[in-house]
Every structure is written in C-alpha cells, then in structure tokens.
Amino acid sequence: SDSLFFSNCQGENGEACAIFAGPFTVTHHKSTLLIAGMFSFMNAGSGSNQSNHMYKLGPIHQGTMERGAKTTSDSYILWPARVGAFSLVMGRHVNHADTSNLPFSYLIEQRNTTYLVPGVNLRSVGTIRDAQKWPKRDKRKDPNRLDYINYNLLSPYTIQKMFKGRSILKELKRVSGETSEIYSYQSAKIKNSSLNNGIRFYEIAIHKFLGNSIIKRLEGINFQTNEEIRQRLKPDTEIGLGEWVDVSGLIAPKSEIDRLLDGIENGTVNRLKSINASFAEMHENYYTYEWTWAYHKIQEFYGLNPETITAQDIIGIVKAWQQAVVGLDKMVYEDAKKEFSLSSMTGFGADGSHDEMKLDFEQVRGDFESNTFVTAVLKHIEDKTALGNELIKRIEAIEL
C-alpha cells in the first residue's frame, strides 16, 4: 500500500494507496482516492476514485493516467485501463479502455458507455493554462535538482501518439465507412463529428510541432543555397529515432532508457550517481534528440525527402505552421471567451439587477480583452506570425 511521490506533488486531505505519483500529481479533497495507478501532471477532482479489485482474484489490477490527464468531480475508473496524455475523464468508466494513442481527448460517460472525443483538449484554454502554470509552481530551491522535468506540451512523446491516433481514426473511418454515425474503439464510442475533428486537431498539432522544430533549426543563419539548408537540417546524432517515453517527467528516446537499463543489468552502471548522470545527459540533450526524431518525420508527414528539400518546400511548411499556430490560438481564444459569457456571471451581484451582476463580475474578473491570458494569446499570434515571416524573408530569394 506504499506510494512513491516525486517533486511538486500535493497530497492534501485525499487518500493515496499504492500509487506512482510523478511530478505535479495533485489531490486536494478528502473524498478523493488514488489507488494502484501511475499518474503525473495530474489534478484529481473531488470524489475521484478508481478500483483495482473485481472481486475475483483480489486487488491485482492497475492502471495508468498518462501525463496531464485529469479527472472531474465524482469520476470513477475501473482498472485496468489506460488514459491518454492530457485527457479529461468525466463520469464512470468500467470498460477498461486504452486511449493512450488518442491523447488530448475527453472521456465522457453517457448511460454507462464511454464516449471518446479525440484531440479536443488541444483547443482547450485549460490545457494551455496548465502547461503555463506547472513551471511557475516548481517550488524546488536547490540548484541540484533530482527530478529532471520536461514541461513541453508537444514533444516526440505526444506527437508520436498523434501520428498513431490519426492513423487509428482514419482506419476506423475506412473500415466502418464515412457515413457511420458512431464508431467503436477500445470499448469506447466515437461520434462521426468527433472522429473527423480528431483527425483535424492532430494534424494541426503535428504541423505546429514540426514547423516549430524546423524554424528553430534554421534560426539565425543566412543561407545562400538549398544545399546549405539541407546540410543544416541534417541531425547531429542518430539518437532520437523510434519510440519516446515519459519517465516520471523526463521525456527521452526509449533507446536511451533501454541502454541505461542494460547497463544496470550487466553491472556497468552500478551507482545512483551514474544513473542520475544518465538522466541528466538525456535531459540536457533533449532538443538535439528531438530534432533527429522530427527530421525523420518530415518525410512521413509532408512527403518530402530531406535530401532534396528546397527553400520553397520550407516556405510551404512554415506557411502551414503559421496557419496551424494561429488557428489553434483562435480556438483557445474562443474557448476562453466562454468564461466571460452571461452564464458565467450568474454567481455575481448577489442581490442586484442584471447590470449590477455584470459590473460585479467585471470588478472581480476584469473584462475579456484585458484578461492577462487573453492578451498573451493575442501576443502569441502576433509573435509567431512574425517569426514565420522572418524565416520566409530570409530564404525566399534562394533559387530553385
């Protein structure tokens, strides 16, 4: 029944039994039980619980909520189950779904059935706010930090799942037909509109990640020829290919984790200091390894051979990236607007008229356009558009 907690966890009032609590696993409520599961960057709503006992062979089951997954009040999951990264769980789920390849989803229960809404959390203002707040809430003071935490929302770890998720959704559409009202996946149901939106959301996020990586790689260099661009795009290392994993906050290529495990098993790595040094090296080289992975995905996603890529191809990718970034930011902006709707003002202006309610709301919450999060989103649109335009200007004169 012992549990393992990593940095910046908060286990106030609630109950934890046999859990692996990665960084920022947070529960604040007396009625909350976290049991026999792996969690990280997780916020448990009041009354959330899980069962690891199906009254047959004892409490032998377990489950995983991947990084950033969170639960609403009174949610319930019957283990074994696996919830994809940055997903939201609402209601009671008893069908043992594995949604690890459909990250950023909603799992909503309707009449004892799990309905899955893939990718929708990508446009949620709550997801963006979470990603911004975690680094600010890191309370560690010691410069020698024992937990290596990568806060990136989009990384090879989540984008690899989106590639798989996109393929899964396209295959469901092909097999069951484009006109099906409901699709079945992993004992969950997906509505037709949700499936099509899911494909679109994942493609937007992939455009955003790969575009970001390319812009970063080509930053600050004046290129004269296409060959110079190709040479710069070539990765610095082979490390980073293949699958990536989240190791309690550290995002790293699985090949490097396997190499460390092999070293521990054969005795060449036999000190805690050496293990920590390996984790430190992976963390420090994250962006080098990330580029290796992204470079090889350019061909898969854009159908371009990096050996023959041209400045015009890069400009096409950057324009798609600009559309993705601005499109996603606009969705987040619209989602934030809901927090300033009339229905959100209902609890304000205790005894007053409609106008006093609105006035009280504005005194407490401010108005929409001057909200710090909203102004940050608008600034982000401006900055990213300028960043893309700068690269286009730098390479558009290169001859084919």
Cite the ranges covered by each PLM segment.
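Terminal amphipathic alpha-helical/low-complexity segments used for targeting or macromolecular assembly
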Residues: 100-400
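Glycine-rich hexapeptide-repeat left-handed beta-helix
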Residues: 2-177
